[in-house]
Design a protein with these regions (language model features):
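Preference for long, amphipathic alpha-helical scaffolds in soluble/luminal domains
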Residues: 1-317
Length: 317
């Protein structure tokens, strides 16, 4: 399957979210293009985004209103992170309602979003919510801006962030993710500094060299939520303009090796930590996290194929 055939596969109408993003992000069609406008409209009628929106309560949330965070990964917080990848925005009233409900459910001290019940921020939540809300069209919202400022304030001075309280690590990618989504022209000098140092943290480790080899980082998965793999790293670093850095070579070679002969990429896993001690813990607990499944494991993935092609497109392949 030649590249054009793969692109045609992504443009099939069964998943208009993928079609819309392929037209706009890979083929660089403007929003005024008739095919782009038709695909954007179709996103609300059929496919993953339409199914998500149809499952909401009238109030704009999923599941139990008492917790937008649990159960993982089926409740409001996790659904919104995925919905942000599916080509919908705040101009749709139902989406805007869910965004407002979501933001009110995670207030951050000082006026941002991503806080817990006490308003205390957690890097993974703040970064993820900021990134998703920017994709929904809230880049001018003061709450999103405050969240970005919080990410600047809480970054490690040497570069990177800590999501687990164990020091900066590759799993803590969400801060870079937020700034990768935020228009470059709006970055402040402090944002630029944090991005440059954060990117260097990943690059000096070649996106994977930290501690013992960790198998989940080499499995491409979706939904990403707050987990890391090398495709997540490549997507971030190339989107931030580091595609020509030679320290991406290992990760790019892995991306090329994982590509099927027909030009597509398989979904390696729904949830990356399904083995070892963490996997045993998940299976031993009756209230364990339930992965949110969009595509079949071991089969060609439209979402991963689009992301893989976007990475290669940014480096001129």
């Amino acid at each position: 399957m030649a590249r054009n055939d793969v692109v045609e596969w992504l443009l099939e109408p069964d998943q208009p979210s993928v079609r819309y993003r392929t037209l706009t992000e890979l083929l660089h069609r403007p929003g005024s293009d008739p095919e782009v406008r038709a695909a954007r409209a179709a996103v609300l009628r059929t496919g993953w985004a339409a199914e998500f929106l149809a499952e909401r309560t009238p109030g704009g949330w999923w599941g139990d209103r008492s917790s937008f965070y649990t159960p993982k990964y089926l409740s409001t917080h996790w659904r919104m992170l995925v919905l942000a990848d599916l080509g919908v925005g705040r101009e749709t009233p139902t989406v805007a309602r869910s965004c407002e409900v979501w933001m009110r459910g995670f207030p951050l001290k000082g006026g941002g979003v991503g806080g817990n019940s006490k308003g205390t921020g957690h890097h993974c939540v703040v970064g993820n919510m900021a990134r998703a809300l920017i994709r929904f069209g809230y880049e001018d919202d003061s709450r999103v801006r405050r969240s970005l400022e919080w990410l600047v304030e809480t970054a490690d001075p040497k570069g990177g962030w800590s999501c687990w309280g164990l020091g900066r690590n590759l799993d803590s990618w969400e801060g870079l993710g937020a700034f990768a989504a935020y228009p470059r022209a709006r970055w402040t000098a402090s944002m630029q500094d944090r991005v440059e140092k954060g990117a260097e943290f990943f690059l000096e480790r070649e996106l994977h060299r930290q501690g013992a080899r960790y198998a989940p980082w080499y499995r491409f998965h979706y939904p990403v939520h707050y987990y890391y793999d090398l495709l997540v790293g490549l997507d971030l670093l190339t989107a931030l303009g580091y595609g020509d850095d030679p320290r991406l070579r290992f990760a790019l070679d892995l991306l090329r090796r994982k590509r099927r002969r027909d030009g597509r990429w398989n979904l390696d896993a729904q949830h990356p930590d399904a083995e070892g001690a963490i996997g045993r813990w998940i299976r031993a607990h009756p209230n364990r996290a339930v992965p949110l499944q969009l595509e079949a494991v071991g089969r060609p993935s439209k979402i991963l194929t689009l992301r893989g092609l976007l990475v290669l497109d940014r480096i001129g392949e």
